[in-house]
Amino acid sequence: MINAKKLYNTILNDSRITDLVKVVQDAYPETIEKFPCVIYLDENQTDIEFADNLPQGDSIAVQVHIFTKALKNYATTSEIGLKVAEVMRENYFTCRNNREVEDIDDNVRHRVMYFTREVFS
């Protein structure tokens, strides 16, 4: 199996994303204090394409959560999402879901994106 977290970390710390957001992290904090932020979670990683009973690759999936404030001078979830999608696609990920999520706080906007990719040894 490949180290998917290392792969996501490299991709999501691309300057096109970090220029728009204050925080990129790989775990959900108890409370989000700095906006905008990107949180990525390793959703699933499975073996694929076996030869001689050994996996020849991985199918990996990642969830990307984008949080921002609905205030002036904050990048929107759409602006950040477009950059995330651009960087992920350049790294051969397919976006299989991209949606705005309702949040309790009126000033907070939340977008969830799901990406998948197959990686072969």
Description of each model-found segment:
Residues 82-121:
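Acidic-leaning, charged glycine-interspersed low-complexity segments
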Residues 53-55, 68-74, 94-99:
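Short C-terminal domain-edge/linker segments immediately following a structured domain
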Residues 77:
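An anionic, turn-rich surface loop/hairpin at beta-sheet edges
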Residues 42-46, 57-61, 83-87, 115-116:
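Short, low-complexity, polar/charged sequence segments that are solvent-exposed and flexible
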Residues 48, 62-67, 88-92, 121:
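Glycine-rich loops and low-complexity Gly/Arg-rich segments
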Residues 56-70, 109-119:
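Oligomerization/assembly interface segments of phage tail-like spikes and tubes
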Residues 1-54, 72, 80:
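Small/polar-rich, solvent-exposed N-terminal microdomains that initiate assembly or binding
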